[in-house]
């Protein structure tokens, strides 16, 4: 089994455990480590992930991996939160962060800008609405009025929670 097939199989197991444990699987990574493979699984849930969530998920996924034995070599399992600075990629990510400040870069200009910092106020099927606090064009700062702006998901290059 190649790494991609292994990752797909482990992602399937992780999704089953995630559903049982009430967490969402954000990402599964597999890469060569010092002694065998390192398997890193990032989990999240509304309100954030606790250490106890990571422990419970880790125990449950280990039980499945021990029985199913998809990894034939030794491996290290790491389970953690994706962190506050992870990219926002889909509707669920934006919904989870309603009320938070975000920075968004778009592939084409919207309201004469491609970079926005604002608070998520609403999320639709294919858009996010933010209350703009500041806009930036190619490195130069320009203070803008507070306004609501709809940004289609398909126009977003990068989005993440803004801590500034």
UniProtKB/Swiss-Prot annotation:
Looking up CDD domains in the UniProt record yields: YlxS_C
Transmembrane ranges? none
Compartment annotation:
Cytoplasm
Q: Record keywords: Membrane included?
A: no
Keywords assigned = Cytoplasm, Ribosome biogenesis
Any single GO CC term annotated in Swiss-Prot or TrEMBL for this entry: cytosol
Q: What is this protein called?
A: Ribosome maturation factor RimP
What's an example GO BP annotation here? ribosomal small subunit assembly
**First-listed, main subcellular location of the protein, grouped into a coarse class:** cytoplasm
Q: Which family does it belong to?
A: Belongs to the RimP family.
Keyword presence, Cytoplasm: yes
Kindly give the HAMAP family that the UniProt entry links to this protein: RimP (MF_01077)
Q: Which Pfam families match?
A: DUF150_C, RimP_N
Tell me the InterPro entries matching this sequence: Ribosome_maturation_RimP, RimP_C, RimP_C_sf, RimP_N, RimP_N_sf
Q: What does this protein do?
A: Required for maturation of 30S ribosomal subunits.
């Amino acid at each position: 089994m190649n790494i991609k097939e292994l990752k797909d199989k482990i992602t399937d197991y992780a999704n089953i455990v995630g559903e049982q444990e009430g967490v969402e699987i954000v990402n599964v990574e597999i890469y060569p480590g010092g002694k065998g493979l390192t398997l890193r699984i990032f989990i999240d849930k509304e309100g954030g992930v606790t250490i106890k969530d990571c422990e419970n998920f880790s125990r449950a996924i280990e039980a499945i991996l021990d029985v199913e034995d998809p990894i034939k070599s030794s491996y290290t399992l790491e389970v953690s939160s994706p962190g506050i600075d992870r990219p926002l990629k889909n509707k669920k990510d934006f919904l989870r962060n309603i009320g938070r400040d975000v920075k968004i870069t778009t592939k084409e200009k919207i309201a004469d800008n491609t970079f926005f910092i604002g608070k998520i106020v609403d999320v639709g099927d294919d858009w996010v609405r933010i209350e703009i606090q500041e806009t930036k064009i190619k490195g130069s700062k320009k203070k803008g009025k507070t306004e609501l702006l709809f940004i289609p998901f398909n126009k977003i290059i990068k989005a993440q929670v803004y801590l500034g």
